[in-house]
Amino acid sequence: MNDSPIARAILRYHPDWEPPPDHHEWNKCLCPFHGDETPSAAVSYDLQGYNCMACGVRGDVISIIRHEEEVTFAEAKRIAENLSVGGNVPVQRKPARKPSRRVFGESRAGRPSGTKPVRSGIRGRPTPWT
């Protein structure tokens, strides 16, 4: 099952690891993340997950990449996309969007035309005793 994304992610960092054949939902295997002589880990090709009972490494493709490379979720997702079939296609980066909240002291030039500012509640009203 070397064509599975979870197997490709593990083989990227541990090329000597042998993926187990796909017999069950969770297939026993030797853990590549620590020295292992008896199978203490399991990989699921259906769920695209990995779990080691001995060292505690578990997760999906992105969490394994984050564990090994110590990168953010977005960077791990880009790496995982390159591991997938047809991974030679460059990943499109979205342009940074302008934040929707206005910063204190920022001009109101972006206000739509024809609108007037809202008066403040009590301070805009005359007091009855003046």
From Swiss-Prot:
SUPFAM superfamilies found in the cross-reference section: Zinc beta-ribbon
Keyword Nuclease annotated: no
A molecular-function term among this protein's GO annotations: DNA-directed RNA polymerase activity
Example GO BP: DNA replication, synthesis of primer
Sequence segments annotated as region (Disordered): 85-130
Signal peptide positions (record): none
Entry keywords, A to Z: Metal-binding, Zinc, Zinc-finger
Protein name as catalogued: Gene 58 protein
